[in-house]
Amino acid sequence: MRSIPQFLIAAPTSGSGKTTVSRGLMALFMKKGLKVQPFKCGPDYIDTKYHEAVCGRPSVNLDTFMASQEHVSSLYARYSADADVAVVEGMMGMYDGYDRDRGSSAEVARLLGIPVVLVADAKSAAYSMAPLLSGFINFRPDIRIAGVIFNRCLLYTS
């Protein structure tokens, strides 16, 4: 498989804005003329329709609970083969799955060897985000956190 820009959008919790951020990034890449291949962790069928509306191509579910890791890897390789960038939207909290992190977004990122961009809901926090993010960055050395997007930041004006 050729090397393309690829990443997984994850968050510490559900409701952090993964879908909004994912769709926004997909739209930005499309506007730049890139062919974007969208993916969604888990069995979700609603978010995949949002992805398809933005990207004009099927969004593929990567579900390590319902399918083998080999099948998930094969789907990812096949559908991203002709893309310029692959964007995988996570589900729930990054490590939330069954039996700890089995079936989680973290498992998919590790399996595919792709970096993670965390979406952190900063609506009711400021400096307290630092230890939270430090925990995510250092919790599993086999999962690379490549960046953080702060969502719902408060704007202070003087």
Regions found by a protein language model. Give the residues of each.
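ATP-dependent carboxylate-amine ligase catalytic core
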Residues: 2-16, 20, 26-112, 120-147
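Conserved small/polar residues in nucleotide/adenosyl-binding loops
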Residues: 156-157
